[in-house]
Design a protein with these regions (language model features):
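Active-site catalytic microenvironments in core metabolic enzymes, especially phosphate/sugar-handling
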Residues: 1-181
């Protein structure tokens, strides 16, 4: 599974290159729709319905033999800086919950973006620690997280502004071919 939360230009270029691959299934999380849910009455009920929609779509990707690529829409919110920071944290926490619910199903995770990756590890997986395995590409680390079933979940921590236009595609190819683990 691949998650792209970063909004920097390089991340968008890398995402677009990845989405050109037919074995990758785009799963777009619309930031405006998420904002409406977090600003409405019945937040928890609507949020759970929204979450279940994404879990179903991601699982359907797996059933089709495709890699789900969960990404936030490339739209900008017109909020003041503190509101924007709080909103993006809520959004990243939501993504972290999705990953947590799928951790035994995904096989590996490529997480693009620092805030997103941090919240997936700390809040979603509640990881007290991970094992650094090394770098998959320059500046891009691979860690493993021990699941309760004694399996290791490889996680690529891919900062938003690091890599080339093809690094996300190249990492995906390496993990799909299982040439590393």
């Amino acid at each position: 599974m691949i998650v792209v939360g970063s909004y920097v230009e390089l991340s968008t270029i890398q995402l677009n290159n990845l989405l050109e691959i037919s074995n990758c299934n785009p799963v777009e999380l619309d930031v405006f729709e998420f904002f409406k849910i977090t600003s409405s009455d019945n937040i928890q009920k609507r949020r759970n319905l929204f979450k279940n929609k994404f879990l179903k779509e991601i699982r359907f990707s797996f059933e089709k033999g495709k890699t789900p690529v969960l990404f936030t829409s490339r739209k900008f919110m017109s909020l003041d800086s503190s509101e924007l920071f709080n909103f993006y944290n809520l959004l990243a926490c939501f993504i972290a919950e999705l990953v947590a619910d799928l951790k035994y199903e995904i096989g590996y995770l490529i997480s693009k973006g620092g805030i997103t990756t941090n919240l997936i590890l700390s809040k979603g997986l509640n990881a007290d620690y991970v094992y650094l395995e090394g770098q998959i590409l320059t500046g891009i680390s691979v860690v493993t997280y021990n699941l309760k079933n004694d399996e290791k979940l490889p996680i690529v921590t891919h900062p938003g502004n690091i890599g080339t236009k093809d690094s996300l595609v190249n990492i995906w190819k390496l993990l799909e071919n299982k040439t590393i683990f």
